[in-house]
Amino acid sequence: MFPLEEITPNTCSGYRDQRGHTLLYNILSGRASGYLNTKLNHNTTAHNCRCEQRRTVCLKDPKATCQVASSVLVKTIHFVRSLPSFNQLPSGDQSSLLRHCWVPLFVLGLAQEKIAFEVTDAPNSSILRQILLGPGLTEKEAERPTLAGVHSLRTCLHYLWNLDLSPKEYAYLKGALLFNPAVQGLSASLFIVGLQQEAQRALHEVIHLLHPEDNFRFSNVLKAASAVQTVGHSLVTELFFKPVIGNTNMLHLLTEMLFVQ
């Protein structure tokens, strides 16, 4: 099962609320992210015109920021590989789970390490160009990071920073997001259901232990779990890793990092 003792000791075992399990399962599986995604988009675009939000952007200091982002990704893969229960899964399931959840885990890593970044207009990007090209944008251009996407990512990060999660809370939240039985094509889905339930139980318990007077913290952490799943894979890849890996396939790179000793 999920190696609770590998991540943090001294958790109690009183939580058995199946309704909470169902709610958290839906959120962690990405099924309840629509509401928060709409709320995030409203917050980030309420005071900005649509054409402004479509502006394509890039990192202001790509060398330094990409180096930090790469370090966060390496730590993320190390966390995943360090879980004995993850290593017990078939290699195909391991690959599928990582491909599905690497962005939420990476965003949690950015938040945990308090990584801030600045962006600037991408070369050859202008509001007029975005308006004129509109639906005629090529696939490559459409994948470029937009100001709206960066705003959404920053909103997620600030939400997590305001929660000020402990290392234990981050660890269990990562575990609950990693073991997602809703991922298509899993051969050990029932086992993964148990792993996610154990992770979410431990998350609830550690929140109760660390914040016994905060009755809303658990639900706020659930909102954070939903928020990180709204961040697009292409945004993270293009913004933080494309300047380094070029045309290398990001999913292939992740698979190599996972299985190469």
Residue ranges: model-predicted function:
Residues M1-Q261:
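Intrinsically disordered, low-complexity regulatory regions enriched in Ser/Pro/Thr/Gln
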